[in-house]
Amino acid sequence: DKISRVEADITDRDARVVDVSGRFVFPGFIDAHTHFDLAVAGTVTADDFETGTRAAVSGGTTTIVDFATQYRGETLKEALDNWHKKADQKSSCNYGFHLAISEFPESISRELEEVIRDGVTSFKLYMIYDDNMLDDGSIYRVLKRLTELGGIAGVHCENSDLVKAMVQEQKELGNLTTSAHPASRPPLVEAEAVDRLLKIAALADSPIIVVHLSTKAGLKEVQSAREQGQEVYLETCPQYLLLDDSVYDLPDFEGGKYIIAPPLRKKEDQEALWEALADNSIQTISTDHCSFTLKQKAAGKEDFTKIPGGMAGVETRPVLMYTCGVETGRITMEQMCRLLSENPAKLYGMYPQKGVIAPGSDADLVVWNPEAKWVLSAENQTANVDYQTYEGYPVKGIAEQVYVNGQLAAENGKVVKEHLGQYVKRKPYPKLS
């Protein structure tokens, strides 16, 4: 299950030889932001670890990092145990967990040391959602503690009070359709929270990750902090690069498919994010895969705030980034490799076990056929969803062969061997440990 040699000419009579002429070979892609088997808005995501990891591997993703949520009153160990029960023996790609911390009493602070020692080295903090969010003082204390221990946090940045006020404003105006969604969470709601987080992180002298960045305004805050010497990492998602907020005005509740938080933005935000990818200002592209069926989405037909927020993406990320990034010249093939594999491996304590093709690294490999042409549709997807948010989208390139821990797991979008995934224990954040 490891790569034994990387050489120009290897002669081994017992080895099976795979001809990959005219193909690219990538280290297995890593999606460091998925939500499988997650309870949201009175329902549970359509994809659990069984179906979600099948979807991942079918598109070329060999490792996912999901979120184990510590609900208030639980220990961190209880949260991790809950998520291991959801994932163990069911995963067709490798998996790890970020720990989402919902409160920060002294007992949780003490427990962090053991958790990090056991290989969970990244954490999720929310600045929004009443059941999960931490106040600013708690965020400061968590960041200081993580910096002591070699952990790092990714943060969902939206101003909770402003979102509540703006949602209420839309309701008072009688705007209950999906068209009101972007107005209820405008770009400055993200930018303010990003700015506040960066100041908290500066006070804590802590590195920080802003997850699912969606706005030009938020990007500017990060660029400004970096100019002051602050250590900030950025993640964005394909939907913020390829879709815009005009979809919320589509008729017949089509807009419901695209209700996510933060919302889809304007074309100018897309452009700013693409430029930031090109100049390496953004480190990773993940998906925030959080899928729901049309029936689940329909819970909010009369009130957009009741639509479960999230969309699928774990399966389509590689082909969308190849088609819309590499083929268009917006990013290079090497940048795609860094954004989808090497950088998340480094940031989340998996490098050089993953994220590189080198002797001793895990044999997670993707053989990429750059010439394949096909069309995305609900019919040809593996994810457990009855629609495709990129329906009819012509794409180029395909994960022709996907190897997980040295075994062929998928070919041309079809899973050929299930349940090859192993749990990944990760190292502390490198600059601190």
Region locations from a protein language model:
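Divalent metal-coordination and catalytic microenvironments
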Residues: 1, 22, 33, 56, ...
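Histidine-rich, glycine-flanked metal-binding segment
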Residues: 1-27
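Alpha-helical scaffold segments that flank or form the walls of functional sites
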Residues: 23, 42-96, 102-121, 138-148, ...
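Histidine-centered catalytic micro-motifs
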Residues: 28-41, 153-158, 287
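Gly-rich Lys/Arg/Thr-decorated short loops/hinges at beta-loop-alpha junctions or inter-strand turns
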Residues: 31-34, 61-66, 92, 171-182
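Histidine/acidic residue-rich metal-binding segments in metalloenzymes
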Residues: 107-285
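His/Asp/Glu-enriched, well-ordered alpha-helical/loop segment
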Residues: 178-207, 257-258, 283-285, 291-372
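C-terminal cap of metal-dependent C-N hydrolases
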Residues: 299-303, 359-425
